[in-house]
Regions:
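Short, surface-exposed, charged amphipathic helix/loop patches that serve as local interaction elements
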Residues: 20-125
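Short acidic, Pro/Gly- and aromatic-enriched capping/linker segments at domain boundaries
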Residues: 1-15
Length: 125
């Protein structure tokens, strides 16, 4: 009998930039609990602000959604290979701070796909 070999990290090749690979954490029970703890308060604040009528509330909600995107990326993107930013090997943090937005969005989509959010849940997170 052969033992099951489960890889907790998934390699995702970039479609936007040849040679760039994202290493994305696969979902597990423990990681899901950790993520829910991190996201819970931000999600509440976003829901409250989106219910408001003012432009300021909408802008604040958009800012919190961007913060949530950054949180998802830092939680699920473990490494980036094949990309240098300002002469140094890219990291998840440097991709979020100074990398091309197209690659940030692509890495974020890979993380969200691994989280398993459906389209309605993705809209709210």
């Amino acid at each position: 009998m052969t033992a099951m070999n489960y890889e907790s990290v998934k390699a995702v090749e970039s479609q936007a930039a040849a040679g760039v690979t994202f290493r994305v954490a696969r979902m597990s029970f423990g990681r899901r609990v950790e993520l829910m703890r991190r996201v819970r308060e931000l999600a509440r604040q976003i829901e409250f602000l989106e219910a408001g009528q003012g432009t300021g509330d909408k802008m604040d909600a958009a800012l919190l959604r961007a913060e949530m995107d950054r949180l998802f990326l830092k939680w699920g993107l473990l490494a980036v290979s094949g990309l240098e930013l300002d002469g140094a090997e890219a990291t998840p943090e440097s991709l979020a701070e100074a990398g091309p937005e197209e690659l940030f969005r692509e890495a974020l989509a890979a993380v969200r796909a691994e989280i398993g959010l459906n389209p309605e849940e993705r809209k709210n997170c």
